[in-house]
C-alpha cells in the first residue's frame, strides 16, 4: 500500500535472520595509522555516488538524501532515486575533496566525494534498523552499517563505524569519557 505501514525481514522459522548477502566490492577498509593522508584535491568537477541498499524490497524508500559539506557553498542537499533492486546513482558538483553525508536512515553515514571519482556505498539496512531498535540495539551487530569504496575510504569507514556526538553542551560532556578520545 502506497504510504502505508510495512514491515520487512520478519523471520517466522527461527529467531536468526538468514546470512546477509554482500555484493562484490562490499568490504571493510581498516585504517592504517602509519600512512599519511593524501593531499586534498582542489578543483571543480563532478563526483559520482552510487551504491545499493542491502536487504532492499520494492516499496521501501524511493529516495536517498545526500548533504555536501562544501567549504565554499556551505550545505547543499541532493537526492538520488532508488531502483527496484535497491541500487542508486547520482552525480554531485564538488570543488575538491568534499565531506558528504547520506542522511536518509536516521543516523548519518559519512563519506567523501572527489571530482572525477566514484564513491560507492553498500548500506546495511538490517544493521541500521537494529541500532534504532529499543529492544535490539545492544544485540550482536549484523555487520558494519555501511561498506564504503572511494576517496578516503578508510577514514570514511572509520567515521561511519563509530558514532560520536557533536553537541558539546555541559550535559553532553558529563556523559562522555573525554580521556578515551586522546
Where in the sequence are the language-model features?
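A non-transmembrane, solvent-exposed segment enriched in polar/low-complexity residues
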Residues: 2-182
Amino acid at each position: 500500500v502506497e504510504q502505508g505501514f510495512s514491515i520487512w525481514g520478519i523471520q517466522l522459522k527461527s529467531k536468526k535472520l538468514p546470512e546477509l548477502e554482500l555484493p562484490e566490492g562490499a568490504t571493510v577498509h581498516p585504517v592504517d595509522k602509519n600512512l599519511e593522508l593524501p593531499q586534498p584535491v582542489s578543483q571543480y568537477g563532478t563526483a559520482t555516488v552510487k551504491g545499493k541498499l542491502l536487504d532492499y524490497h520494492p516499496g521501501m524508500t524511493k529516495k536517498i538524501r545526500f548533504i555536501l559539506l562544501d567549504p565554499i557553498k556551505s550545505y547543499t542537499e541532493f537526492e538520488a532515486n532508488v531502483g527496484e533492486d535497491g541500487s542508486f546513482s547520482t552525480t554531485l558538483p564538488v570543488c575538491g575533496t568534499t565531506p558528504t553525508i547520506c542522511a536518509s536512515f536516521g543516523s548519518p553515514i559519512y563519506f567523501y566525494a572527489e571530482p572525477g571519482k566514484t564513491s560507492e556505498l553498500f548500506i546495511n539496512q538490517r544493521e541500521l534498523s537494529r541500532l534504532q531498535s529499543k529492544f535490539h540495539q545492544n544485540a550482536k551487530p549484523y555487520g558494519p552499517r555501511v561498506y564504503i569504496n572511494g576517496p578516503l575510504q578508510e577514514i570514511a569507514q572509520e567515521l561511519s563505524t563509530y558514532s560520536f556526538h557533536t553537541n558539546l553542551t555541559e550535559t553532553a560532556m558529563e556523559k562522555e569519557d573525554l580521556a578515551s578520545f586522546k
